[in-house]
Amino acid sequence: FLDNMLRDKKNHRIEEIVVPKNSWTIGKTLKDLNIKEKVGLQIIAILDPISQNYNYYPNATDTILENMTLITLGDSERIETLTKFIN
């Protein structure tokens, strides 16, 4: 899977995006953000900024925290859109 993804001309990659301090998304759930519908990406994991534990199966009810890391898989254009979306 990863070999094919890295060779794909569509420039897919796994990306970690940190939720900034003043993000409007803080305190909202993944369901509230509706990232899959609005941006076209799925959040495949999250890193809790307090415990430093990864959640590889994030739920729609998980709440966004300041400095939380969102891990996604997608093309560079959608990843850039997600970065702007959470800022």
Predicted regions and their residues:
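Cytosolic Rossmann-like ligand/nucleotide-binding regulatory domains
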Residues: E16, K21-I86
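Flexible, Lys/Arg-rich cytosolic regulatory linkers and terminal tails that connect or flank
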Residues: F1-W24
